[in-house]
């Protein structure tokens, strides 16, 4: 009995697969049966032949296919969640399988502060917040660096190579500290420069 049941089951499976692959060329009733089952399962809706092309037929209790367009974040925006691109749903259709389209608009990121500091430096010796920190950190290590830093800063430059302030801007505290540290560094020849440099 089990052999007969398995044989009938395999025959039904083969017949169903044959009808599904052949798309009703051999047996149209089988195709309609499969389409009714698929419409119940929500895979496809009932279709009619219109001018040699299959189109979805409205009505008949067919399920309306509603799908949302799922989008992923751009790789560049994934690094900074603050500038994640907003995705906008343009259009959607319930009759087609998935005719939703999405358009993304990625805002341009703000300029980096490093590039901005170079632009300010090129303008001619404006106060930069990093000059004082760089000068103090480099000049407080030993007497040699103190002497060199003081010579550079006293000659009218600074640690990053900006020209002397000739546009009427006030000198930064980092430049003034560089001159003071340079003067203290000159005393390093007598053995006092190391202590003064570390005391800062």
Swiss-Prot record:
Highest taxon of source: Viruses
Signal peptide location: 1-24
Compositionally biased spans, kind Acidic residues: 184-200
Region (Disordered): 124-200
Alphabetic keyword roster: Signal
Keyword hit for Signal: yes
Name of this chain's protein: Uncharacterized protein DR3
Organism: Human herpesvirus 6B (strain Z29) (HHV-6 variant B)
């Amino acid at each position: 009995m089990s052999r007969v049941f398995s044989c009938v089951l395999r025959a039904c499976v083969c017949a169903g697969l044959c009808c599904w692959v052949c798309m009703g060329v051999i047996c149209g009733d089988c195709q309609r049966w499969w389409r009714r089952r698929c419409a119940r399962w929500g895979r496809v809706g009932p279709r009619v032949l219109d001018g040699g092309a299959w189109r979805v037929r409205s009505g008949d209790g067919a399920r309306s296919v509603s799908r949302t367009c799922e989008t992923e974040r751009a790789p560049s925006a994934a690094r900074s969640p603050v500038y994640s691109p907003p995705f906008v749903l343009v259009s959607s259709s319930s009759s087609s399988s998935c005719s939703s389209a999405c358009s993304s608009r990625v805002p341009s990121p703000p300029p980096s502060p490093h590039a901005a500091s170079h632009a300010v430096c090129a303008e001619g010796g404006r106060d930069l917040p990093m000059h004082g920190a760089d000068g103090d950190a480099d000049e407080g290590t030993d007497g040699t660096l103190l002497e060199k830093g003081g010579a550079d800063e006293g000659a009218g430059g600074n640690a990053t190579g900006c020209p002397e302030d000739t546009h009427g801007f006030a000198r930064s505290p980092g430049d003034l500290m560089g001159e003071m540290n340079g003067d203290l560094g000159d005393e390093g020849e007598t053995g006092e420069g190391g202590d003064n440099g570390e005391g800062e």
